[in-house]
């Protein structure tokens, strides 16, 4: 978790201050009481170049902003409507800058020439609908090296007095956006689940950079596919070590995940930061609009260990591919805690929505019987539960489960909601003994 930094106390000092500031060209009522302070460090993105956010949106807010072509979007969610005053806490390094702003279809200009932090009124607006709001800033002219440094957007008036949701802390996680999950409770009532089968379809246009569409999750790991860059995609299978640490170098030898075998062209190694363990991935150019199949096996092995093996089926290849087989020490179990998730792992793309369909889930017991999993329990992570981000949803559509997150949409599914899809009866037809 990143530190929220020493600047936050400044935000809270502003929440009830009275402002009469002559520096802004847009008018705000005298004696405005600023009820909310939205830190740009957790709530702003460079809309025209999302990856530029990593250099322009810093721990203290917007900085190093020199290109006029960049459009800065600041997002926040309001439950109230009515009149709202808006201002920036901002400064310039030198000279004078003029910024263009857009909010709710209203546009205008702001002038800055203060080199100390000051409150720059933008103006008064009518908020007609509750939900996510977006303030957009663009640089127009500047005589100094940068357009402005902006620490926060301040809100006052009737619309700002109600409940507001925005990223207040843990900016790294808030910028990544909320992670959402589908748990399959029917599997918990099946004795000794050895195999878990799932299918995922990512519609065209939803394969957003930074997405991890996780198909086959279990208590000790997860298996799915990712969009890692504009040119690279991966099929990822990871198993956590029983030793609790975020640093794989700290894991004792007798608690390390051991590789048993791996598929052709599969990378294997260790991972950290969100637990630690064994990681394997295949670089594979999977495509949006195509349904891919995932198969996982988990069963006890000798010496209080458990073996986990993952296979991936791409219809364009027409065959199952081995990703890897891992042995986990100090573990004696079959598969349990079966679930799927959708997460964004790149903070710079946390303002872009992504969606996937999860369909035809099955679990196979040690007696050889397949069980269709037609029920799912929807949950979300702390970013969602704390109300830092509300752009998450999931459920059942057109016969399949789905997950969607990020992008500041207003549709939202209540956490801990149960869903049921129609049974397909399409039991997996797989020669389990013939798998690579």
Label every PLM stretch briefly.
Residues 19:
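Short, conserved catalytic or interaction motifs in soluble domains
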Residues 15-16:
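C-terminal motif of bacterial Sec signal peptides marking the signal peptidase cleavage site
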Residues 2-10:
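Sec-dependent signal peptide recognition
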Residues 23-285, 293-436:
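Extracytoplasmic
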